[in-house]
């Protein structure tokens, strides 16, 4: 491993807010994104859009001759301004990026995504039946951007931001990868949580003597759930794990390209999460969260009847919050909360030849707002 692993990295517990801080190097309230981009309260800190007088990292890099590319999630524009007629000033091309391919909202279907190329809404280039998946498509597009850049302007520096739909819900991944995890999580979130803490202590991610807090509020012991619920919950977690592995495989294609094109030693790579694991699946998870969001209950019998559909094109799955608790080991609470489980997140920095202990650990406090000024420096 060549990336430095930061154990004290902090975010803002939600996606839009963290992205605003990441892109500006400032507190998210200070730039107008105190909450999600979906909402505009009218108050200066909560406009659902990065303030026009605050430069983004892409805008600052452009001033130094960089070409800037973005693929994937944006979620930094008010929903009322994401239609085909704009306004476009808050879209990626209006905030310093030269090319954009991705989606504007918080999430999208991985098999039927709501895609935008630059400033134009477009149809997805494939379907589940033709083998399409958004993660692969985004990395394909990122590679096209980089190859085109190198062919046309090899002496011009570039900045690429890759924001996958993974691992935000809906958790959708190829069936063979989901099947791979069929038994991986059969022991449940309590056993998984204990095992992860032991591994964290062994590898130095947390200090010796670190103890788990009690289960989060409303999370029941795995043993208190019925066997058929165990099967459902394990399958939902398997879909999440498969989606993560699927992205990891395709991210590897991007790193391989940097290596093959002899750019890897000149490229700093940062991999981070914008918030902790999500509690939005509730106590039992969802096979079709859209029904629940529209006030249509999803009874346990209905979930169980659709076990084989989980992760496929006709589902919008999310895992139970017991798995989110395990994902945030050894911290309390989740995404949306200002507890450790919401704001302490992974950061890996790969800077070949620039640090003496590539693959080492860093335990100091750092915040997502530190990244833009550090990159600029």
Predicted regions and their residues:
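Formylglycine-dependent sulfatase
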Residues: 1-377
């Amino acid at each position: 491993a060549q990336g430095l692993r930061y154990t004290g990295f902090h975010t803002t517990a939600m996606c839009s807010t963290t992205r605003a801080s990441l892109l500006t190097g400032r507190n998210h309230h200070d730039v107008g994104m105190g909450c999600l981009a979906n909402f505009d309260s009218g108050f200066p800190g909560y406009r659902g859009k990065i303030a026009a007088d605050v430069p983004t990292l892409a805008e600052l890099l452009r001033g130094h001759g960089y070409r800037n590319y973005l693929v994937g999630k944006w979620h930094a524009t008010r929903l009322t301004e994401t239609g085909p007629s704009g306004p476009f000033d808050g879209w990626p091309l209006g905030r310093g990026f030269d090319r954009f391919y991705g989606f504007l909202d918080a999430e999208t279907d991985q098999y039927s995504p709501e895609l935008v190329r630059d400033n134009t809404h477009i149809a997805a280039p494939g379907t589940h039946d033709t083998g399409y998946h958004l993660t692969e498509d985004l990395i394909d597009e990122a590679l096209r951007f980089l190859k085109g850049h190198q062919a046309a302007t090899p002496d011009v520096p570039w900045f690429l931001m890759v924001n996958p739909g993974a691992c935000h819900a809906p958790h959708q991944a190829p069936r063979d990868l989901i099947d791979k995890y069929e038994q991986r999580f059969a022991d449940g979130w309590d056993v998984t949580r204990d095992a992860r803490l032991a591994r964290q202590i062994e590898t130095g991610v947390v200090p010796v003597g670190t103890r788990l807090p009690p289960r989060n509020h409303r999370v029941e012991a795995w043993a208190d759930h019925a066997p058929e619920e165990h099967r459902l919950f394990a399958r939902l977690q398997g879909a999440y794990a498969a989606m993560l592995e699927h992205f990891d495989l395709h991210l590897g294609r991007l790193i391989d390209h940097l290596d093959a094109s002899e750019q890897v030693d000149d490229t700093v790579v940062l991999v981070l999460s914008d918030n902790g694991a999500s509690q939005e699946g509730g106590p039992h998870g969802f096979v079709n969260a859209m029904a629940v969001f529209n006030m249509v209950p999803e009874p346990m019998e209905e979930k169980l009847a659709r076990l084989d559909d989980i992760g496929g094109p006709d589902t919008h799955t999310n895992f139970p919050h017991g798995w989110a608790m395990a994902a945030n080991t050894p911290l309390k609470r989740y995404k949306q909360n200002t507890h450790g489980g919401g704001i302490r997140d992974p950061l890996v920095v790969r800077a070949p030849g620039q640090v003496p202990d590539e693959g080492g650990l860093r335990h100091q406090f750092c915040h997502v707002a530190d990244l833009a000024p550090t990159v600029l420096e």
